Amino acid sequence: MNKTAIALLALLASSASLAATPWQKITQPVPGSAQSIGSFSNGCIVGADTLPIQSEHYQVMRTDQRRYFGHPDLVMFIQRLSSQVSNLGMGTVLIGDMGMPAGGRFNGGHASHQTGLDVDIFLQLPKTRWTSAQLLRPQALDLVSRDGKHVVSTLWKPEIFSLIKLAAQDKDVTRIFVNPAIKQQLCLDAGTDRDWLRKVRPWFQHRAHMHVRLRCPADSLECEDQPLPPPGDGCGAELQSWFAPPKPGTTKPEKKTPSPLPPSCQALLDEHVI
């Protein structure tokens, strides 16, 4: 499937999530041992943790949206990464969307983030902590040129390279989605230490943030992991294909009906949503 068709499918998936979703009616985590259920784009979570809003190492954006819930492994990853960044004097980590209290489908903006194992992190590390007003209405820093072929050299910083590398080297991380131009710059800057690049995957948009995804926890027996990324650093023909013009004759795919929820997620909705 060519990139244009993939883009249209991604847009349709995101558009489908614009419809009202019952998951928003669940305002607190569902009690129980932490269990990520289903797939990243069709699932839910029991026993989610709340990311502490107050931290000396990170700040949480758009707290009014209440998207700061996730599996305990995700909360620990954020705390681990932000502590590393702070210890290196790189700045404050800016945390975007995680998931809703019980996971599930958003009403817009995301097709995934449903099992408590995804988090968006801004690709900027302010040295001065943001004000409450800045956090509620964050200004994203677009690192990619208008033509989408490279990063903006005046905005690309070694600290951003290090932030992505630190996240990719974490044992629990399986994928990090960034814009193809950002992946390309990482490939140029990486030197001989390149194993971590395998986890960094080019994807549409993602011009100002990285989307980090963790592996399914071992004790979440109903969690569906993705296959591992292809071997290698992903800096060759696959990456370059993202910069090729779309093939003529690309047709818009038919709108897909959302897949049925995993039975455990449907049961959760039936119990907790009137």
Swiss-Prot record:
Gene Ontology biological-process entries: peptidoglycan metabolic process; proteolysis
Record keyword Transferase present: no
Protein name per the record: Penicillin-insensitive murein endopeptidase
Residues annotated for Zn(2+) 1 binding in this entry: 110, 113, 120, 211
Domain of life: Bacteria
GO cellular component, one term: outer membrane-bounded periplasmic space
UniProt cofactor note: Binds 2 Zn(2+) ions per subunit. Zn(2+) ion 1 is bound in the active site. Zn(2+) ion 2 is bound at the dimer interface by residues from both subunits.
Cofactor(s) needed by this chain: Zn(2+)
Protein encoded by which gene: mepA
Listed GO MF terms: metal ion binding; metalloendopeptidase activity; serine-type endopeptidase activity
UniProt key word Transport: no
Keywords, comma-separated and alphabetical: Disulfide bond, Hydrolase, Metal-binding, Metalloprotease, Periplasm, Protease, Signal, Zinc
Protein's cellular compartments: Periplasm
Span list, region Disordered: 228-264
Gene3D superfamilies for this protein: 3.30.1380.10
NCBIfam families, per database record: PRK09429.1
Signal peptide range in chain numbering: 1-19
Listed transmembrane segments: none
